[in-house]
């Protein structure tokens, strides 16, 4: 027993002398990774400069000094990572708040613009009166009634909103032309009232209207006056007939005298 104790003392003295010069690493038993604690597993994060990739490299336990330094470095790295994450989260929150503020301002501006536009429209339309399509087109013929007639007639499958307006304008132009001609014809006859006969005669006198309204019959329009020249008894024709009769009688007398 004494020998063993003496040996231990000697080894301790040798270790003390060696520690003063160069510290020796203690003998660490080999322990599998499964039995180790989480704190004992140390990882060093190495950032590659060329490629921004992080590599986790496990290190075996060699020196307690290195182990403590690694633990402190890991703690510092963890704290730095936590701080960075907190800063990133704060920045994201601030950015989201800014974006929400911008969205709110844009929505408020849009709503204000819509309200102002509605107010302007209401002011514009308040002064206007509800006008019909014929009034807006400066026409006397009713556009709505003409559209109804077109739809009831079923001349086409579809009827646009512009078709009755154009048709009303054309009909109005034709009626004005016919009325002007009939007024002139009535003034020539010293009449103060336009009759269907005047309208019929005005259409027959105009070549374009006559071509357009060939097959149209006007009620109580009558017939244009036309007497064949043979039926007319003129004084010239009467004298000519008398002369012809006298010549015939003289010829007959000459023929009878020659026979006798």
Swiss-Prot record:
<feature type="compositionally biased region" description="Basic and acidic residues">
    <location>
        <begin position="111"/>
        <end position="121"/>
    </location>
</feature>
<dbReference type="GO" id="GO:0000786">
    <property type="term" value="C:nucleosome"/>
</dbReference>
<feature type="compositionally biased region" description="Basic and acidic residues">
    <location>
        <begin position="248"/>
        <end position="260"/>
    </location>
</feature>
<dbReference type="Pfam" id="PF00125">
    <property type="entry name" value="Histone"/>
</dbReference>
<dbReference type="InterPro" id="IPR002119">
    <property type="entry name" value="Histone_H2A"/>
</dbReference>
<feature type="region of interest" description="Disordered">
    <location>
        <begin position="65"/>
        <end position="122"/>
    </location>
</feature>
<dbReference type="InterPro" id="IPR032454">
    <property type="entry name" value="Histone_H2A_C"/>
</dbReference>
<dbReference type="GO" id="GO:0030527">
    <property type="term" value="F:structural constituent of chromatin"/>
</dbReference>
<dbReference type="InterPro" id="IPR009072">
    <property type="entry name" value="Histone-fold"/>
</dbReference>
<dbReference type="InterPro" id="IPR007125">
    <property type="entry name" value="Histone_H2A/H2B/H3"/>
</dbReference>
<dbReference type="GO" id="GO:0005634">
    <property type="term" value="C:nucleus"/>
</dbReference>
<dbReference type="GO" id="GO:0003677">
    <property type="term" value="F:DNA binding"/>
</dbReference>
<protein>
    <recommendedName>
        <fullName>Histone H2A.v1</fullName>
    </recommendedName>
</protein>
<dbReference type="GO" id="GO:0031507">
    <property type="term" value="P:heterochromatin formation"/>
</dbReference>
<comment type="similarity">
    <text>Belongs to the histone H2A family.</text>
</comment>
<feature type="compositionally biased region" description="Low complexity">
    <location>
        <begin position="67"/>
        <end position="110"/>
    </location>
</feature>
<dbReference type="Pfam" id="PF16211">
    <property type="entry name" value="Histone_H2A_C"/>
</dbReference>
<feature type="region of interest" description="Disordered">
    <location>
        <begin position="236"/>
        <end position="260"/>
    </location>
</feature>
<dbReference type="GO" id="GO:0046982">
    <property type="term" value="F:protein heterodimerization activity"/>
</dbReference>
